[in-house]
Amino acid sequence: MDEKRLTHLRQLEAESIHIIREVAAEFGNPVMLYSIGKDSSVMLHLARKAFFPGTLPFPLLHVDTGWKFSEMYQFRDRTAKEYGFELLVHKNPEGVAMGINPFVHGSAKHTDIMKTEGLKQALNKYGFDAAFGGARRDEEKSRAKERIYSFRDRFHRWDPKNQRPELWHNYNGQINKGESIRVFPLSNWTELDIWQYIFLEKIDIIPLYLAKPRPVVERDGMLLMVDDDRIDLQPGEVISQRMVRFRTLGCWPLTGAVESEAQTLPEIIEEMLVSTTSERQGRMIDRDQSGSMELKKRQGYF
């Protein structure tokens, strides 16, 4: 990795650590959202650096839908045990009682009840006034216009027309009771930055990001990995072994794999250098309707 690139990554690292420390100093009850993916892994690594040799001054929160890849649950529990941080896991009890199923109820309803409502329930339950998230501006157009400190009202709603100015590295965290701030320390990172930093810092990642033969079924132009026996095969669908990996991770029935031969971090980085598509092309929830992500964020989604 050349010196200019290394300097660029260290600048991003310093900015993110500064943001994490600012939030820890400014807010009374912050939390870090942990979705188990590559961005969460980088954000956790940066947080550990920010407070080394001490422990994290805030817990991690995983909003569980019950439909994550089995490898994600294993990686989550192993990471929590290895690093010894406080891990909170919340699953929407009403959604569980209703038997919400992405195959039966669709991606929009599943996401709204199990993720958006589940997140709001957890934030209310523990009274968090700031929540870190691993979203980046290069991921999607609504995230591109969102501030690093993203103000949310007492219903956890985001208003893109009512955002606070952020001049240089000055952030406005003033809130009233019941309001909160979503904080995005990785806002200025790109997908390539993330992978190069993972390689540079030797950060442990879930193997789903690396290509290997996996059982998949083709549906609506996406390759869905068959993770367990809850798969609802449609007429004419056949499960086959394909060499695939994931660029983004979510609920397995709603997350498409990409065909790839990249089995190592250098090969992923090489693939990123020539990629012309968004990593979120594999997220079914982004296809629900035009402006889908912005609508979800207005309702309280991350």
Curated annotation (Swiss-Prot):
Q: Name one Pfam family in it.
A: PAPS_reduct
SUPFAM superfamilies (UniProt xref): Adenine nucleotide alpha hydrolases-like (SSF52402)
Reaction equations catalysed:
sulfate + ATP + H(+) = adenosine 5'-phosphosulfate + diphosphate
Keyword terms of this UniProt record: ATP-binding, Nucleotide-binding, Nucleotidyltransferase, Transferase
Q: Taxonomically, which superkingdom?
A: Bacteria
**Listed pathway(s):** Sulfur metabolism; hydrogen sulfide biosynthesis; sulfite from sulfate: step 1/3
**Alphabetized InterPro entries for the sequence:** PAPS_reduct_dom, Rossmann-like_a/b/a_fold, SO4_adenylTrfase_ssu, Sulfate_adenylyltrnsfr_sub2
EC no. given is 2.7.7.4
Query: What are the protein's GO molecular function terms?
Result: ATP binding; sulfate adenylyltransferase (ATP) activity
User: Which class of enzymes does this protein belong to?
Assistant: transferase
Gene Ontology terms: biological process: hydrogen sulfide biosynthetic process; sulfate assimilation
Q: Which HAMAP family match?
A: Sulf_adenylyltr_sub2 (MF_00064)
Assembly mode: Heterodimer composed of CysD, the smaller subunit, and CysN.
Q: What is the role of this chain?
A: With CysN forms the ATP sulfurylase (ATPS) that catalyzes the adenylation of sulfate producing adenosine 5'-phosphosulfate (APS) and diphosphate, the first enzymatic step in sulfur assimilation pathway. APS synthesis involves the formation of a high-energy phosphoric-sulfuric acid anhydride bond driven by GTP hydrolysis by CysN coupled to ATP hydrolysis by CysD.
The UniProt entry's sequence similarity note says: Belongs to the PAPS reductase family. CysD subfamily.
**This protein's name:** Sulfate adenylyltransferase subunit 2
Q: Which organism is it from?
A: Serratia proteamaculans (strain 568)
